Amino acid sequence: MKLPIKFAFASIFLFLAAGCATPRIVRNIVEPAIPSYHQDINGVPMRRVAVLPIDFDQQTESTPNELDLVFHAELTKTSAFEVIPISREELHAHFGIPQLSSVEIIPSDLLVRLVQDYGVDGVLFTDVTHYFPYRPIAIGVRCKLVDAHTGVQRWVFDHLFDSGAPQVAIAAKQFAVDQESEQSPIATDGADILDSPTQFGKYVAHETYRSLLGI
């Protein structure tokens, strides 16, 4: 059966248009890992915060202290509030414990003592919930910021940073590139961060505490 002339021309036009059209390019854009968090915006601003030692369960002496330094440094860079580090020795001297998890019951006099001795508005608990220092490096972090006067949680955070995930690896390398560009004019792709638990820990701390802004 012959098609009417107008339909034949229409079919030819569609065929030619389809052949000349530029194919649509689909790009998979990987976004940096931005963990979810919660904050209570009704509380008064935090100006001085006591930062407790990181709660770390693995049997090692050096790693917790190294993580304390790394996390304190990145927290200070946020300028979210004045950071008052509480050492493991101080915590043990006052309360008989070297560290305290964010999910443990807070000793009844801890907040009162910290307010009296250090004049703080809040207390920050940080736990390393997972630590795998070999490639692919993975570090899990759980945090809680508590109002030192009321005991109310002002901010909570719980996230696993796994460098085996492409979006995490990309974000970590970009962090390393940004850090290197501030210190050295030598170009780098930032890939070394994926082999260093200390450097990757800096990225983890940066991303964790970045969400504190606005508290």
Regions found by a protein language model. Give the residues of each.
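Solvent-exposed loop/turn segments connecting transmembrane beta-strands
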Residues: 60-62, 130-137
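Residues that line or immediately flank small-molecule/substrate-binding pockets and catalytic motifs
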Residues: 127-130, 161
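C-terminal/domain-edge helix-coil "capping" segments
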Residues: 20-45, 110, 114-117, 136-138, ...
